[in-house]
């Protein structure tokens, strides 16, 4: 088995840390740490008085002092939102003879005004400090900060990043991290080709380093372990780069993964009793994937326990005595709960089922199952993505059917704010009558008969079915589908566009069965069934001949359980990280419940074919 990683909580990437509006307010009058009040000798401080008072002071003074008061009046007008008056005041100042500090403050104020007016390019053009100006750090700080923000919003992210490298020297230590995180966000807008084309001067070593790190991140975005190694190597070769102290949050999460070699893992499954066949199929899939893994550590010890043959207390005692580091299973919900209650040693767990209520204190536990509820939720997402607006869900009148329809409807409500139409069917004998009722044929026939009696004239009216339904999601096995499909087709008014029929994987029980009666129905299933790897399936059929699709799904489930043991820590750390498995595209939610995105196919006269996206 490959090197394993300890679990860590998923870290969210940092969004831009300084909102434009907040920045504009700051730049209208940059505060010092002691909130120094503006005076004629300190035009760089906050304008705390009204513009009217500043203008009065300007009129009553001369020379440099008068200009100072006029600059403070401009800053106050911007702060007050008096943009027309601020424009006029800015023009007045442009005709005055300004010192470098006054010129810099005027540029900053005028750029802030254009920024707040939404004139980003004009604001940027305004900022043009000259290198020979002897200016205080306060002004340089605001100059580079505003230029970086403007360039970023104008889509010139590499130039924005360059401004942030120059800004760093003017920032106090408690503001440096936010600046470097914003620089990282600027570079994250680029792919590797764009990053490699950025023109750099020889002395821009800091910016070059950030670009190199960003290229590594892009290159290994789906290979977190390799990314960790590459960043480690880069840091060792660049010991003085600020990334050592201010590593971007997403890279920090990667670096927090601790590689730990697992020597001892256990598989807990029902290998006797009622669930024997399911347990053995999962076991065979797990071991199959393990043997196929050429990069695994051959010294890893795997122990398989039969959860039906001994108590969980006895199994737990053996796990602790053996020094087991990771458990896969159990398969039954009640056994999962029993394991967690006995797990005083905090052994990492990938449960192969999900209890009704997740225990949030079980931070070392993740959950993976072939959840029919997840399949129903995905069906709602799939129908919504296909543009359907009024789906009807038909399910068996049972607890299982209720769970499936509830899952579909909850997802549909989240997507549309509306409930889906839901109905049930019973025994095979009742299906035709129930379909007629569901699609309104019985009511329609009754209305026609009533009109005939009232008028005494035979009406040539056709029975009308519901017109709004544009899709039907059928939660049914194959025999039920075989009955439902023709009855629905008969019930639909021929003048109305028939609803598209969809089904769950329950309707696809056997790879070799005749599905011609189901042609046209689109259904969800695992990739191994919809897009099988021929070489793998040939080997599978030779080892386990004539297996049903149910057994194939369980075998694939076992294979993916093995894959997830290696991938879980990366899934927990890297946002939007997914893995292609035999049962679907695999990711996790914030409770470490594995989410499966299944494939879709269509029944045809010749079998099944992948559905068009």
UniProtKB/Swiss-Prot annotation:
Listed GO cellular component terms?
periplasmic side of cell outer membrane
Q: What membrane topology term does the record carry? A: Lipid-anchor
Q: In its UniProt record, which GO terms are filed under biological process?
A: peptidoglycan biosynthetic process; regulation of cell shape
Q: Which Pfam families match?
A: LppC (PF04348)
**Subcellular location, in the record's words?**
Cell outer membrane
Instruction: Name the domain of life.
Output: Bacteria
What residues show lipidation of type S-diacylglycerol cysteine? 30
Cited InterPro entries: LpoA, Peripla_BP_I, TPR-like_helical_dom_sf
One example of the protein's molecular function in GO is: enzyme regulator activity
Show which residues constitute the signal peptide.
1-29
The answer to whether keyword Cell cycle applies is no
Stated role: Regulator of peptidoglycan synthesis that is essential for the function of penicillin-binding protein 1A (PBP1a).
Which PANTHER family is this protein grouped with? Answer: PENICILLIN-BINDING PROTEIN ACTIVATOR LPOA
Task: Quote the subunit structure annotation.
Answer: Interacts with PBP1a.
Tell me the protein's name. Penicillin-binding protein activator LpoA
């Amino acid at each position: 088995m490959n090197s394993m990683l300890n679990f860590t909580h998923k870290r969210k990437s940092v969004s831009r840390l300084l909102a434009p509006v907040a920045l504009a307010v700051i730049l209208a009058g940059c505060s010092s740490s002691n909130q120094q009040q503006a005076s004629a000798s300190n035009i760089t401080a906050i304008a705390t008085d009204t513009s009217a008072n500043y203008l009065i002071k300007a009129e009553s003074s001369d020379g440099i002092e008068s200009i100072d008061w006029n600059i403070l009046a401009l800053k106050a007008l911007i702060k007050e939102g008096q943009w027309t008056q601020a424009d006029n005041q800015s023009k007045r100042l442009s005709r005055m003879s300004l010192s470098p500090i006054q010129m810099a403050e005027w540029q900053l104020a005028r750029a802030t005004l254009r920024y707040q007016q939404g004139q980003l390019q004009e604001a940027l053009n305004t900022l043009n400090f000259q290198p020979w100006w002897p200016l205080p750090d306060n002004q340089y700080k605001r100059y580079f900060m505003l230029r970086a923000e403007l360039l970023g919003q104008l889509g010139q992210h590499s130039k924005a990043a360059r401004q942030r490298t120059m800004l760093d020297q003017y920032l106090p230590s408690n503001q440096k991290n936010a600046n470097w995180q914003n620089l990282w966000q600027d570079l994250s807008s680029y792919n590797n080709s764009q990053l490699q084309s950025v023109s750099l001067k020889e002395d821009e070593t800091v910016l070059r380093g950030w670009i190199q790190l960003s290229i590594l991140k892009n290159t290994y975005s789906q290979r977190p372990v390799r990314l960790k190694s590459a960043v480690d190597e880069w840091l060792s070769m660049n010991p003085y780069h600020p990334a050592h102290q201010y590593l971007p949050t997403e890279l920090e999460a990667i670096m927090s993964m601790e590689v730990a070699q697992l020597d001892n893992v256990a598989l807990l499954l029902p290998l006797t009793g009622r669930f024997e066949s399911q347990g053995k199929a999962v076991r065979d899939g797990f071991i199959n994937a393990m043997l196929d893994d050429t990069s695994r550590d051959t010294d890893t010890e795997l122990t398989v326990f039969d959860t039906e043959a001994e108590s969980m207390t006895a199994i737990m005692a053996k796990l602790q005595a053996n020094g087991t580091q990771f458990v896969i299973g159990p398969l039954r919900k009640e056994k999962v709960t029993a394991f967690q209650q006995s797990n005083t040693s905090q052994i990492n767990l990938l449960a192969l089922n999900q209890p009704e209520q997740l225990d949030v204190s079980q931070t070392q536990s993740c959950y993976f199952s072939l959840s029919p509820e997840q399949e129903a939720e995905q069906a709602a997402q799939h129908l919504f993505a296909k543009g359907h607006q009024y789906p009807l869900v038909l399910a068996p009148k049972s607890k299982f059917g209720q769970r499936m329809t509830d899952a579909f409807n909850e997802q549909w409500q989240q997507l549309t704010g509306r409930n889906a139409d839901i109905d049930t069917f019973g025994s095979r004998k009742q299906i035709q009558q129930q379909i007629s009722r569901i699609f309104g044929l019985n009511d329609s026939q009754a209305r026609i008969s009533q009109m005939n009696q009232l008028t005494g004239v035979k009406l040539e009216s056709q029975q009308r079915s519901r017109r709004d339904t544009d899709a039907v999601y059928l939660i049914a096995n194959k025999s039920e589908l075989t009955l439902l499909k023709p009855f629905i087709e008969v019930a639909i008014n021929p003048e109305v566009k028939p609803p598209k029929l969809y089904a769950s994987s329950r309707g696809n029980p056997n790879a070799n069965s005749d599905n011609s009666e189901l042609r046209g129905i689109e259904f969800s299933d695992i990739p191994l069934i919809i897009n099988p790897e021929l070489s793998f399936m040939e080997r599978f059929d030779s080892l386990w001949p004539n297996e049903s699709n149910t057994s194939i799904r369980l075998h694939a489930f076992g294979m993916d359980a093995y894959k997830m043991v290696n991938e879980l820590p990366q899934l927990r750390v890297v946002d939007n990280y997914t893995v292609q498995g035999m049962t679907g595209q695999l990711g996790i939610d914030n409770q470490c419940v594995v989410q499966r995105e299944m494939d879709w196919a269509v029944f045809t006269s010749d079998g099944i074919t992948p559905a068009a996206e």
